[in-house]
Structure formats: structure tokens, C-alpha cells
Amino acid sequence: LARISRSITRRRVPAAAAVLPSRSADPLLRLCTFNVNSIRARAAHVARFLERQKPDLVFLQETRCTAEQVPAMEFAGLGYKTHAVGQAGGRNGVAVIARIPFEVLAEALPGDAEDSQARYIEVAAAGIRAAGIYLPNGNSGGDAGFAYKLAWMDRLRHVVQARLDAFEPFAVLGDYNVCPTEADLAHGALPATDALVHPESRARFRALLHLGMTDALRALHPNETLYTYWDYGPAFEANRGLRIDHALLSPELAERLEACEVDTAPRAEAQPSDHTPLIVTLRDT
């Protein structure tokens, strides 16, 4: 496996020391997740999205480059600071882009010191903790690849449990590579054997909800057909998609949930990512 291009922070930071003061200028906080499928190829797409939606904090997945190769200056001109966790070889990679102050708490998911894949970043900002994740797909690598996915989800559950036990306002946004139910994919979009719909993948996603996390989109849109991913080709025009990008909120943040939307505009652009942004709006405390 390729090595992460920045040092990994595995020490848990106490909430009192890590969480930054809440902003007072704006009563709303807008968080976003966006799998860009190569940040260097999609930098202009991201910049247009930032200009149009003006989110406060954005988690990116599948940046597909080292941290130093992320085009941070393109976003700095719009008032956004970038922190990336990269990986050589054009694989994986996550980043956070924010126009509000933030502190990086972790650059790797705890629980496996040998895991060098760039899939997790956790920050403190605006009085909350938030993590951006790129959960393993699980379809490649045979049985070992699927086992890695399940183990990764188990590690994530332990992190979420710790945050909930500490009563910390916590959000986990990203590409989960899981369709939680049959309502989260177009009919016939995936075979029943696919790792994104496998019963064990879905069970581990439900386990996060059973801990007390809230699926932000389904909390506000329980019955709507909403997708965040469409394969290249005619899938987008036919709305033959998947809902695999999610925002899960702790009880403290679920109480503040104002809106959650899928922004399909970036997916409709020329040469887009196969994903599109998911935006969560939280009321101030």
C-alpha cells in the first residue's frame, strides 16, 4: 500500500482543548461532502461549487494525489483554507476545505496502525467535531478487500461510540460506499452481490444509526428518490443512481438540523465527477 504523504495524528484530543468557539456572525453552519474523483481534474468544478453555494466546510474524497499536489491556491482565492491527507499512486485521498477556522485532530482512522490508506480526516470547527471519510468500496481485492471494508466500518463504529459517550457534537460526512436500503439505488443498478448493498455492509451502517447517529438526508426526506452518485454514460440523464454519500449526525447536531440537500448541478457539468455534493445546514446553538 502507498504511504500517506503527511504524518498521521492518532492521539485523541480532549474535546475541551480541540473544539473551537462557535461563530456568532452567521446563525447557520453549512457542511458538505463531495467525492471529486481527482481534485486536479475537478478543481474548477469545486471552485464553481464554492462560489455558488458558499459552504462553510467541505470534505473531499478521492482526491487521487499527494497532499502537496492538491491545488489549494485555487480555493484560497475564494477565501478557503485547505488541508489534505494524500496518497501516492493516484489512489484515495481526502481533504477539508473551509472558510471558517478549523483545527485538524486526526489524519487517519484509529484502530489499525498498519493501515496507510488515506481515507479519514477529523477536524474541530465552529464548536463541533466533524470527520470526512472515504470508506472502502469492498468490491476489489476479493475476500480480503471486502474484509477490509467491514473492518474499517467496525473501527469507525468505535470512534463514533467514543464521541457519543463523551456527548460531543459530532458529524461524519463522506463517501460511505453503502446503499443503506433498496430505496437508495435505482432498480437494477447493482447486483445483489455488490459490496455496496451486501447485508453485512448494510448491517454495519445500521449499527451507526443504532448508536444514536441520524442520517441527515433521510431525517428530512424519508421517502424521496435522491441519489448522490451516477455512473458515467447515460446513468445521470436516466437518474439511474445510488445514494452512497451520507452525513450522519450525533443527537446534539441532529437537533440543529435545518436542511439537507443533494446539489446535482456539478454532476450536470462537462467532465464531472461521478458523485455530486451533499450539503447539510445546521442551526446555531
PLM-predicted stretches and their roles:
Residues 2-94:
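N-terminal, active-site-proximal structural segment of metallo-dependent hydrolase catalytic domains
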Residues 261-285:
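Surface polyanion/phosphate-binding segment centered on an Asp-His-Pro turn
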Residues 22, 121-125, 280:
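Short acidic-hydrophobic surface loop/beta-edge motif
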Residues 89-104, 235-256, 282-283:
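Conserved beta strand-loop-helix elements of the APE1-like EEP
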Residues 31-35, 46, 50-68, 130, ...:
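Active-site beta-strand/loop signature of hydrolases that rely on acidic residues for catalysis
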Residues 110-111, 135-153, 189-194:
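Surface-exposed cleft-lining segments at the edges of enzyme active sites
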